[in-house]
A protein has these predicted regions:
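N-terminal pre-catalytic segment of deacetylase/amide-hydrolase enzymes
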Residues: 1-63, 268-271
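Short catalytic/ligand-binding loop motif for oxyanion handling, primarily in non-cytosolic enzymes
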Residues: 18-20, 52-53, 73-75, 97-103, ...
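Generic structural signal for well-ordered alpha-helices
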Residues: 29-33, 50, 79, 132-136, ...
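His/Asp/Glu-enriched short active-site or ligand-binding loop at hydrolase and phosphoryl-transfer sites
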Residues: 43, 50, 151-155, 178-189, ...
Length: 272
């Protein structure tokens, strides 16, 4: 089997029966995972991603599964499917929204994305976000890794009246890192930017805090030559057929398409 020249990274948020922004239905999500598993795609670990960017080898059909924010449906809808097909995934946590409490053995259908936002505004994040107990349960399976999505998910550069956005960003990332260390015993070197937005100063700050793999919402070929500071991701769609996913993975693993992808960067969605 030949080696991977580019690593496609799939970006998910919600998997729910309630349609809406950044949401796939359980049926579509399971169909995509079944197709990946049945087509011989290898879902990679964080350590394998780091080695890839250092020049290490991955099988040609390698893909990374990422989920942003830490929604409760990642526990109730995503995790059972990952177990069913033996797939590895990564969840970027907004650590300031993750609560305490026992594992929820039964979860009724979760709200839509807009409804989830309203719960959070009302101080009821626990109704729609993961708990540390559920995170530990998923982590112990060996199938799910957890990384930082900052502590607050704020775009400090857009906050009115803020004169020191870089200092606040540094504190935000640092607080997330320390919270993950306190609750999970460690924090990885992987960080996802809120709304996918970044610039060179952000990259510098993240590096100073120990983060080496930085995730965006841009469409790009991910190769060792491009480095791990601007990892692009493919925003997933609610499509019945696996053909859409097959075409996307072909494009993002075929070097001839790299120049085209560079001209068409993906949209930066709210709550990424």
């Amino acid at each position: 089997m030949s080696d991977a020249r580019s690593l496609p990274v799939l970006m998910y948020h919600h998997v729910s029966n309630k349609p809406g922004l950044v949401t796939l239905s359980p049926h579509t999500f399971r169909s995509q995972m079944r197709w990946l598993a049945g087509s011989g795609w290898k879902t990679v670990t964080a350590a394998e991603v780091e080695l890839f960017y250092l020049g290490g080898k991955l099988p040609r059909k390698s893909v990374m599964l990422t989920f942003d924010d830490g929604w409760l449906d990642n526990w109730s809808q995503v995790f059972p499917v990952l177990r069913e097909f033996g797939l590895h995934a990564h969840i970027f946590l907004i650590t300031g929204l993750i609560g305490d409490g026992p594992v929820r053995e039964r979860v009724d259908d979760t709200p839509s994305h807009r409804e989830c936002e309203e719960y959070i505004k009302q101080g009821l994040a626990d109704n729609v976000m993961l708990r540390w107990s559920e995170i530990r349960e998923m982590r112990s399976s060996g199938l799910v890794e957890f990384h930082s999505h900052t502590h607050t998910h704020r775009r400090w550069d857009l906050m009115p009246g803020i004169t020191n956005p870089l200092e606040l960003l540094r504190a935000d990332i640092l607080l997330s890192r320390e919270r993950m260390k306190d609750m999970l015993g460690s924090c990885s070197r992987h960080l996802c930017w809120p709304e996918g937005w970044y610039h060179p100063d952000y990259i510098r700050i993240a590096g100073e805090l120990g983060f080496t793999c930085l995730y965006t919402t841009e469409r790009r070929m991910n190769t060792p030559q491009h480095g791990a500071c601007q990892i692009g991701r493919i925003s997933t769609k609610e499509r019945e057929s696996s053909g859409w996913l097959k075409r996307r993975l072909f494009c993002y693993t075929t070097p001839v398409f790299s120049s085209l992808l560079a001209l068409h960067k993906g949209p930066r969605l709210s709550w990424n």
